[in-house]
């Protein structure tokens, strides 16, 4: 068995989760068993994995494991049909599609919040005291059973959370205590697990125990995808290899080793080796550690398509991926401004998500300052066929990321025959893109000139599109799987 491990599957997944999921699917398609393993509690986990192209048999979540809920057939729980709400005693009112109120003799005793992206299905139920304070909250699993109950102090902070099997048996409790003035989880208690109770101080300790239990049943190779979980690994007694896949550069912009990797690189965490996306990074990292550093792609493209100018929105630039300060999205705005000096109707679309409201406000201000208000748009985060349509509707992909591990968004665009203009950074574009499409970091004019050339010369665009599609062949499933098998992982 191959265990590809990270924190969660999110509503807005990053390249790490997409890479992990694509590799899971790839391995299984070659009858090489693999699981997408996650640590975090997520009642909608079995819905979000679908956006990653996975099914219930390809995933393993820690909480599912202890809740005896790894394979549960979904039964939709409509709040008006749920047997947990006695209709003879309570009245249900629905002031809006996202919430219903449970009333007893005219007083609201509970609020039922509909599960996001569903119609009237149980999401969570908040129980209220006579002062409208939340005293408890039930979380419902996407598959239709009550998964946990959290109990609250009068100040709104959680005191205790209980987790259930689909049959309603309590199997896990998390106690929250005051630590330096803040209520925090301080004890994870497994109840009657294999006939005994177990206590852990942290979620990571519980995860280590979980993996050891899983490995007793199905020994295998571990590949960890997230540095935030490095300290879960030393206690895992894997009978085979333990590897860390680094999806980014190992250094910051000043060339200094990331502090999160210091113990790993010293060999203090019990890993068998480190895997990176490019041979260039492999060569740079190997002198820094006694661990073997291996190289295999973190990107897999489903199929190659030859794009057509007829499909593109003329002079449209696309920026794809998470919108974050370290990705320098403001550079794309300056480049657009330079492009418009020669191609007045050029437009720019950001496609991705951001959790940084301050950054978005700063970008809005810069858009106004540069006079780009009518030519820049921010599109919704999309996946699958909708993402394909977005890529095929652009004429150029622009990447202003100053540091890369691979550059998944570039490779995905290239597989659709979309030309890419990117900063010439290590461990990404300069390993699979021609020099004429690479520009120095921060050189707005040179990037703009390359884009203008593609916009104004159809023959040049078609040739760039052909080369992009051709180069993306390096990342097809068959090619990538062979490179992974050549690693000879333990």
Predicted region positions:
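A short, well-ordered alpha-helix in the C-terminal region of glycosyltransferases
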Residues: 460-474
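Aromatic "clamp/platform" in nucleotide-sugar-dependent glycosyltransferases that forms part
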Residues: 402
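Glycosyltransferase donor-sugar binding loop
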Residues: 347-361
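C-terminal alpha-helical cap of glycosyltransferases
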Residues: 474-490
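Conserved acidic donor-binding segment of nucleotide-sugar-dependent glycosyltransferases
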Residues: 434-445, 452-459
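Nucleotide-activated donor-binding/catalytic signature segment of Leloir-type glycosyltransferases, i.e.
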Residues: 360-381
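Conserved donor-binding/catalytic core segment of Leloir-type glycosyltransferases
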Residues: 308-327, 336
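Short hydrophobic beta-strand element within catalytic cores of glycosyltransferases
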Residues: 419-422
């Amino acid at each position: 068995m191959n265990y590809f491990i990270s924190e969660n599957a999110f509503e807005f997944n990053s390249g790490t989760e997409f890479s992990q999921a694509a590799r899971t699917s790839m391995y299984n398609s070659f009858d090489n068993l693999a699981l997408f393993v996650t640590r975090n509690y997520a009642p909608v986990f079995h819905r979000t994995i679908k956006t990653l192209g996975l099914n219930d048999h390809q995933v393993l979540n820690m909480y599912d494991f202890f809740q005896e809920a790894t394979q549960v057939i979904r039964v939709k729980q409509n709040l008006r049909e749920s047997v947990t709400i006695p209709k003879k005693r309570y009245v249900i009112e629905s002031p809006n599609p996202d919430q219903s109120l449970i009333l007893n003799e005219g007083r609201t005793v509970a609020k039922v919040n509909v599960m996001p992206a569903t119609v009237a299905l149980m999401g969570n139920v908040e129980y209220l005291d006579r002062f409208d304070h939340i005293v408890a909250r039930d979380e419902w699993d996407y598959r239709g059973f009550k998964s946990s109950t959290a109990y609250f102090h009068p100040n709104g902070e959680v005191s205790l959370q209980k987790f259930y099997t689909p049959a309603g048996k309590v199997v896990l409790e998390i106690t929250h205590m005051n630590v330096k003035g803040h209520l925090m989880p301080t004890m994870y208690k497994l109840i009657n697990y294999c006939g005994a109770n177990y206590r852990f101080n942290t979620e990571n300790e519980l995860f280590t125990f979980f993996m050891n239990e899983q490995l007793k049943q199905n020994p295998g190779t571990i590949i960890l995808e997230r540095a935030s979980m490095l300290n879960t690994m030393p206690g895992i007694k894997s009978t085979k290899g333990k590897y860390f896949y680094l999806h980014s550069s190992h250094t910051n912009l000043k060339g200094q080793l990331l502090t999160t990797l210091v113990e790993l690189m010293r060999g203090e965490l019990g890993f068998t080796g480190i895997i990176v996306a490019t041979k260039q990074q492999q060569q740079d990292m190997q002198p820094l550690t006694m661990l073997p550093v291996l190289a295999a792609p973190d990107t897999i493209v489903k199929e190659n398509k030859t794009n057509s100018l007829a499909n593109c929105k003329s002079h449209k630039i696309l920026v794809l991926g998470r919108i974050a300060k370290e990705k320098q999205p403001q550079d794309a705005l300056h480049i657009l401004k330079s492009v418009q000096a020669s191609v007045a109707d050029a437009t720019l679309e950001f496609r991705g998500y951001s959790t940084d409201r301050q950054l978005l406000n700063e970008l809005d201000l810069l858009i106004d300052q540069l006079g780009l208000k009518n030519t820049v748009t921010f599109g919704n985060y999309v996946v699958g066929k909708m993402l394909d349509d977005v890529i095929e509707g652009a004429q150029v992909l622009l990447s202003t990321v100053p540091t890369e591990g691979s550059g998944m968004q570039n490779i995905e665009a290239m597989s659709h025959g979309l030309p890419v203009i990117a900063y010439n950074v290590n461990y990404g574009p300069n390993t699979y893109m021609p020099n004429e499409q690479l520009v120095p970091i921060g050189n707005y004019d040179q990037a703009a000139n390359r884009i203008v050339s593609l916009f104004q010369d159809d023959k040049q665009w078609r040739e760039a599109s052909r080369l992009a599609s051709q180069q993306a062949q390096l990342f097809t499933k068959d090619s990538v799987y062979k490179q992974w098998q050549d690693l000879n992982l333990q």
